[in-house]
Regions:
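Cell-wall polysaccharide-cleaving catalytic domain and substrate-binding groove, primarily
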Residues: 1-114, 119-202
Length: 202
């Protein structure tokens, strides 16, 4: 399923997960895909829930974001009879806000996701969750450069997926330009592990 890689490495699959935000410029992060409070994605998710008729959007909106009351409501939703609906809503939002925009941007740059393995779809999902859909083309074009091709249209075929996945994770995302966090080595360890998981599924 699209989202498996991101779910595993962002929160280990838990829709009720709340990070403490320590050392993270994104602040406290929530859910399966660790929606950032400081970057605005948490607030956008709550607004999306309300706009799309999810009653628990109004429930969360009763409280200040990141407050103890908000956190309690979030955890209750993830561990109650509504848990599956809450998890499904997080996934639908991630597709809407991250994956679909990334796919559209890549298509404009000559990379059509329907020409690739389902694992590549999961890679696009994961990279757009972590870095935002606005950087996906730059990331993939840089990866293509490491592969020795001038642009994405040259590798718009499933036969290039293995090498592209390696280049995205181990060349681009692991570079100092893309990963200069205080916990750089830990993040790079994630990239190595996630890359191998993706390759094993091809």
């Amino acid at each position: 399923m699209i989202g498996e890689l991101s779910a595993k490495y962002e929160s280990n699959g838990g829709p009720g997960t709340i990070s403490d935000g320590y050392g993270d410029p994104g602040g406290k992060s929530y859910g399966t895909y660790q929606l950032s409070s400081n970057a605005g994605s948490l607030e956008e998710f709550v607004e999306w829930l309300i706009d799309n008729g999810y009653w628990f959007g109004n429930e969360l909106n009763k409280y200040y974001l990141t407050s103890p009351e908000f956190d309690s409501a979030w955890e209750w939703l993830a561990n109650s009879a509504n848990a599956q609906d809450f998890a499904d809503a997080q996934h639908k939002y991630a597709i809407y806000a991250y994956y679909d925009p990334a796919v559209r941007s890549l298509r404009t740059a000559g990379f059509n996701i329907e020409n690739h393995n389902d694992v590549m779809k999961d890679v696009v999902f994961s990279r757009s969750i972590q870095y935002g859909p606005g950087l996906i083309v730059e990331m993939f074009e840089e990866a293509v450069g490491y592969m020795g091709y001038p642009n994405l249209s040259y590798i718009d075929d499933v036969k290039f997926d293995y090498d592209l996945i390696v280049s995205v994770y181990l060349k681009v995302c692991s570079s100092l330009e893309w990963n200069n966090s205080a916990v750089r080595e830990g993040v790079n360890a994630r990239f190595r592990s996630e890359c191998q998981d993706a390759l094993d599924r091809l």
